[in-house]
Amino acid sequence: MKLRIQLVPKPLFERTLREALGKARWDKLRHRLAETNGARCGICGSTQRLHGHEVWAYQQKKGVATAVLLKVQIICIDCHDIRHFARTTKLFQAGIITPDRYGALRKHFRRVNGCRQREFDEHFIRALRTWARRSKQKKWKIDWGEFRDQVEVAKAARTKWAQSHARRSLTT
């Protein structure tokens, strides 16, 4: 299957490379990766509305589990909405995504993977079960992989900024 639903465990919501780097660094990385990939979706080849998608591997053990960042993949909005299909479904149920858009996304999955609706439904159910199992794990550590140094630089810059602004507020 070229296009898969990849649901992020609940304890890891908002713990993303994008958040760790900050918007400016994330945008710079995303644009560099898009240029490297010919400004095309790494899954379906579309050139429309490209996103940076974090690809993670999860290692669950008793105690502390680990989320390992494998890569940042450039993908289109359709593939991105499929990767996070539980979120997409919530937006659909809230009326934020139209029935036409929701149906088009399901069709996109079937077209990219050359499968039937039943296979999509089964894949989604398996993804939800995996998500539920992983979400029960409360303690997680993050391995930023090849992005570790970039995360450390961003963290140091934020700390330096916070310290300089704290000193300013004390002197005014």
Report each predicted region and the residues it spans.
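Extended charged
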Residues: 1-28, 47, 81-172
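Short cysteine-rich loop/turn motifs with clustered Cys
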Residues: 23-51, 76-78
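Histidine-centered nuclease catalytic patch
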Residues: 42-74, 83-95
